[in-house]
Structures are given as structure tokens and as C-alpha cells.
Amino acid sequence: MARKGNPISVRLDLNRSSDPSRFSDYYYGKSLYQDVNLRSYFSSIRPPTILTFGFRLGRCIILHFPKRTFIHFFLPRRPLRLKRRDKSRPGKDKGRWWAFGKVGPIGCLHSSEGTEEERNEVRGRGAGKRVESIDREKQNEIRIWPKKMQRYGYHDRSPSRKKNFSKSLRVSGAFKHPKYAGVVNDIAFLIENDGPTSHLLKRTLPAVRPSLNYSVMQYFFNTKNKMHFDPVVVLNHFVAPGVAEPSTMGGAKGGSLDKRIRSRIAFFVESSTSEKKCLARAKKRLIHFIRQANDLRFAGTTKTTISLFPFFGATFFFPRDGVGVYNNPFFEYAREQLLGQLRIKCRNLMGKDKVMELIEKFIYLGRIGKLIKGIEMMIEIILRKRIIPYGYNSYLNEVQKMRSFLSNRTNTNTLIESVKIKSVYQSASLIAQDISFQLGNNPISFRSIFSQIVKDIPLIMPKGVEGIRICCSGRLGGAEIARTECGKYGKTSCNVFNQKIDYALAEVSTRNGISGVKVRISYSQNKKGRAISETYEI
């Protein structure tokens, strides 16, 4: 009698030399909690809109293994509908599906003191994001929850907020980490620019606005340690000579510009240092301030001048790569000049010891190091130096924040890698998730799903794919008795140890119960076909 081979799930490199107790019920709750929190965090980073790409629930795949957790993001191609819309409207601004564009303001805290008009105002402008507070003694945080969690059934059960909001801030992102407490008093202050270069800024600086929101919310709820300074004076100190840009806000002069900056920040600081102010008034002014902050322009570029406005508590932002200015010697010289002026002015204002402490703090937080090197647009998750749209940099910046946050909070080495999928058959997990989505949303039979998947396999077989095997178990089609249906195309040998196989498992909750999907893809030994799991160094 022939000996039965080990299951393919055990022969995978990811699951070898692992503790069997890892798959017991003891760790199930921990894995479920981790998965739900990761998905809610991803969806809160950037909700999708009609013309902008965002993290949508179900568009990321999280694979938990005994020693690693893989997170797969799948970025589709630009829809044909948008291409036709751009051609039909030559005079309109063309929306780019991969660009993050303008980030909506963070919705303010809902309370009983607020009027119905203010609540409708928040819902209209803050669509997609909602701030819910959690009044806990041990957690001095606020979490940005997605407005709606589909497919999972996890509703927003966070308690309603209390009057004392000094205990109730939780901002989604890397600012949760305790190492950012040293810069909690720093405030972002910027100048509005509505000049002819605003269209360039929308393409080159899409990742700045989320950081401004985090910084504003972070400073607003700090009521213990206050930092008294004049934002306008500090701004004038830190802008390099000859690098300033004239005001373009409707012909406003420098004095009126200073007054606008002061008026925007005056009530902002007063509300943050007093807990006895009217909560409804503070909420209304905060919403107005955040909306104005979302419309600010963070840098302006012309043929002869450059305007760089650094601020504490966030990253130093400069023109992005992809528009032909990143390697310009003039920009490099202006960046070094700004850094030199920053050190000189800091030394004159605070003294050498304080300056060195501040510089070390920024180096520890990754600020000055990035400034000296030039802002790193492509972090190590892009390994093959592919040409991608520069709007994609926003996604990379958010992933970098997410990676550092997960690494610091879990004390593990977190690697989030971006892999370009040339074919859907490169990932068994993608096919398994796609089948589970179809079974959960549409009453479609397994045979029709299988026929749609395998119809393009003959076209990609010369590229390294030998075959595919798909099994689906459960009450398929509403049957009273659960059964298993399998489909096979090509060669799918599961009894050879040196066979290159990608395996994935997915579950979906339907009205008839839970159904499971297993996908195995076999790759040729001679060709260069490989799965996503093989792109990681395991």
C-alpha cells in the first residue's frame, strides 16, 4: 500500500518547525483580535472615494502563520470608466484612481452639547472617517474607526464620549507610540497658498495632509504641558533667507497674513489649555480649523524660488520625486541652506544644549536623518525599482507608519512588502479570497466560478503555471447536507516534495453557514513562475 504524503499545508516552508499548539483554540482569540484590529486600522488610513484609491475592507489579505503575518494589498488597474470620463471631459480636472488626493477632515467628537446642524456639518465633510472617543482610565487614546465595517459584522460599539476629553484622544497612526510623547507640545503651522502651482502640489504632496491632521489632534488634547510661543515669529525664524514666498491669498499683505495665522491658532490654543470652555463652541471651532488646515498648501515651487515651511511634530516635506525636481541642485542647495538656518536659529533661541537635545530627538524619530538624505520616497518595500505613479508615495508613507507602529507595539520585526502581481495566478490566496467573496455576495454555483477562473490558464501556462486545484466545502447552493466539490486543471501533484506549490485557505460566512475554499497552484520547475509567498525571504 502506498504511503500517504504529508498535507500540503504542513509541507509549506511557512509552517515547518512550528509548535502544534499554535493552531489550538487557545490562540484563536488572539489571532482573531489581531486580524480585526489590523483590518480596522487599514480601513481608517484612507477611505476610498469615487476618484481616489483607498484601503477598502476585503481588498487586503492578512495571512497569519506561526512565526509571521503576511499582509497582501492588491492595487487594481485604472478602470476603463475613468479613462472614458477623462476623454469626454477635457476641461475638467482628471481624477487619478491611484492618487490619494485631498484627505477629508477628521470628524470631531460627537456629544450631547452639539447641535444637529453641527453634526450634519461633520457628516458632510468628514465622510469616511469618524472619531469615536473611549473614556478609559488606562487608555489615554482615541481611535479613528472606519465608518462602516462590511463583511465582518463588527459594528462600532465604542461608548459615547464624556465631557472630560483630556483622557480621550486616540489618533490612528504611528503617533500612538510613547516615543512621540516628547514632541506632544509641538504644533504645525503653515501658510495658505492658492497660487498657480496649486495643481502641482495636489500631485506632489498628497501624503502631507494626514500627518497634519494627526499633529493637530495630538496637540489639541494636550492639556497638561503647555508651550507658549508666537507661531508667526517662529515661522519667520525658521524660513531661510531668500526662500520666502509672497502671499497670494487674494492680494493680502504680510500684516493681514500674520493676523490670519494668529486668529486661526489663538482659539485653538485657548481651547487646548482649558477644560471649562463650552464644549460645543470648541467643537465647532476645531472643525473649522481642521477644514482650513486641510486646504493649506505645504510648499510652493516656481522657476526661480522655492518655499519650504518646516514645522515641529511632523515630517519635513519637500517636492516629491516623479516631477523632475528631486535631483535638482537648486533644491538640494535650498534644503541644506534651510537645515543650516534651522540649526543657527535654534542655537540662538534655546542654546546649544537644547539644540543638541532637539536634534538628537529628531534623529531618533527619523526626522533629521531623512532631511539630510533627502526625503526618502521609496522605502524598502519597493525592492525592484519599478516605475510607479508618484501618487503612490502616499500609500508608501502610510505603510511605513503602519510598519513602524506594529514593530514597536509588538516587539517584532514587521515587514510589509509591495509585490507587483503580473497575473492573478501568482497568488493562491488572491484566488481563494476572490472565490470566498463571490460565494458570500452572489448565489453562484461553484462550477461557474471554477470555469471562470480556469479559462485563462492555457494562456499563462508557458509562463510557469502547470495547473490549479480548487476545493470548496459547505452547504453549497443551499443544500441541506454539506458536501465538497473540487475542480482540477492541469498538473497538480501534491505528493512530490520538490514541487513548487502555492497553497491558500479561505473561509466565508454565508446565509447557509460557513464555507471553506482551498486553492493549490503548481508551478513549473524549469520556468520562472513563483508565488507571492516565495518572494519573501523566509
Swiss-Prot record:
Please list which residues make up the signal peptide. Answer: none
Any idea where this protein resides? Mitochondrion
Please indicate if the UniProt record lists Transmembrane helix as a keyword: no
Q: What is this protein called?
A: Small ribosomal subunit protein uS3m
- List the top taxonomic levels of the source: Eukaryota, Viridiplantae, Streptophyta, Embryophyta, Tracheophyta
Which key words are in the record?
Answer: Mitochondrion, Ribonucleoprotein, Ribosomal protein
Q: Where is the composition biased (Basic and acidic residues)?
A: 120-134
- Which family does the UniProt entry place this protein in? Belongs to the universal ribosomal protein uS3 family.
Molecular-function GO terms, alphabetical: RNA binding; structural constituent of ribosome
Q: Which stretches of sequence are listed as region Disordered?
A: 111-134
Instruction: Give the top-rank taxon of the lineage listed in the UniProt record for this protein.
Output: Eukaryota
Provide GO CC annotations from the record: mitochondrion; ribonucleoprotein complex; ribosome
GO terms in the biological process aspect are:
translation
Q: Which InterPro entries match?
A: KH_sf_prok-type, Ribosomal_S3_C_sf, Ribosomal_uS3_C, Ribosomal_uS3_CS, Ribosomal_uS3m_plant
Entry keyword Zinc: no
